[in-house]
Amino acid sequence: MMKTKNLIVLLSILFFSCQEEIKLTYTPISDKVLETAVIYEANIRQYSPEGTFKAFTKDISGLKELGVKIIWMMPINPISEIKRKATGGSFTSEIEDKEERKKYLGSYYSVSDYKAINPEFGNKDDFKELIDTAHDNGMYVIVDWVPNHTGWDHPWITSHPEWYTQNEQGEIIDPINPDTGKSWGWTDTADLNYDNLDMQQEMINDLKYWVTNFNIDGYRMDVAHKVPPVFFNEAITELKKIKPLFMLAEAEQQELFRNGFDMQYAWEGHHILNNIAKGEASVKEFDTYINKQKELLEPTDFTMNFVTNHDENSWSGTLKERMGDASELLTTLVYAMPGMPLIYSGQEYDLNHRLKFFEKDSIPKTKGNTWNLLTKLGDLKNNHLAFHGGKIAASYERLTTENENVVAFKRSKEVAEVYFIGNLSNQVQSFILDVEGTYEDLLLNKSLILNQKKIQLAPWQYYLLNKVSP
């Protein structure tokens, strides 16, 4: 009898140990991977006509052409039906026509169950196949997590109302802007109460579930600046006991780096690029931003740079709408500057319409100029030391042009160097650059001789150069 009890105890220990640690059959994500990575935001609903995991999985091997090493999945969980939103901001419950109501699928960020799969995309086996396929192709998968709020039919609403923020009448409320005391407008969600430690522990358990059972490689934390950093410190510490992970914060909050995150958004930099394209900012604002980042961030901190993402595309406009003729230059710039570049679903196929957020839509699938550009840039990011942008990034040196509309800088690491020179305006610009030698244009495969003579650039023209000889 004693032997039987001991065996049961031993098996229990082994079982629970397996729940906390998993044996990896592939090389886990590492700082070395982050140096050379391109990250891809996968909008499963809109990626294909089917809008499924299976349809996306078929294309994973093709993403290698773009240099993609990390796939960020927009939320994979089921979406609440209570207070589900329709295009235009109304609730679907306010739509009388049943057929019209059906077409509104709701916001990914109104989660009804943290441990379930949105049936719109497929099932758990389909998701496992997606992850395995990514790993087989040398890529890693992170999942978009919504820690700040849930949908209104999440089980916690009824089982643990104390886990939510409540007003003076004891009613659960949607997230409030602390600066105004008014709703953010996310009325299809219920605000979680991080003063409740039981809720925090259950959240950590749910986060562990996807790492342990599906072998995902990390998380992108939605509105991370709205959640106490101390929670992330505890959660990420626990998660990284299971396996190495990559953590992305949708925030610009330096404190989050000290609490477990590897990368944060470059929202400020992105808005500066938008303004440059509109003629409302110049190289001066770009330089100020780069210098500010150097002052605020530690050498191992880095940002995600982008010209588009799901928020920008759906709510602010397409790349062409926002950046116009500057689109190609600015796309190249986010690869050349320190950090990790992002590709959003459809960007690689010259997506030129705003994807619907609450209903089905689809991206184009014809390879054109942007695919060719991103293929070249992805290859450079993966293989050229001077493009390294993670925790041991290539250095950044600003070069003098004495023209407030022309930016020039050098990135270097070990013996590798790359030069970016760009006209950030819609007017012809002339300048002198204190650089000499023969250079190769890495995108055009042409030679260029620089000899400190006046250089002229057409509107939005740029060079991406590799030094060939003195």
Task: Specify the residue positions occupied by each region the protein language model found.
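Active-site clefts of carbohydrate-active enzymes
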Residues: 299-321
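Substrate-binding/active-site clefts of carbohydrate-active enzymes
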Residues: 21-40, 45-55, 60-69, 75-214, ...
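Short, solvent-exposed turn/loop segments enriched in Gly/Ser/Thr/Pro and often Arg
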Residues: 72-81, 144-154, 222-228, 250-255, ...
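Bacterial Sec-dependent N-terminal signal peptides
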Residues: 1-23
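Hydrophobic faces of well-ordered beta-strands that scaffold small-molecule active sites
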Residues: 38-40, 71-73, 141-143, 219, ...
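Carbohydrate-interacting/catalytic domains
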Residues: 18-43, 48-72, 78, 323-324, ...
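Soluble or luminal CAZymes and related metallo-dependent hydrolases
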Residues: 52-55, 122-126, 198-203, 227, ...
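Active-site-proximal helices and loops of the catalytic beta/alpha 8
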Residues: 206, 212, 222-303, 333, ...
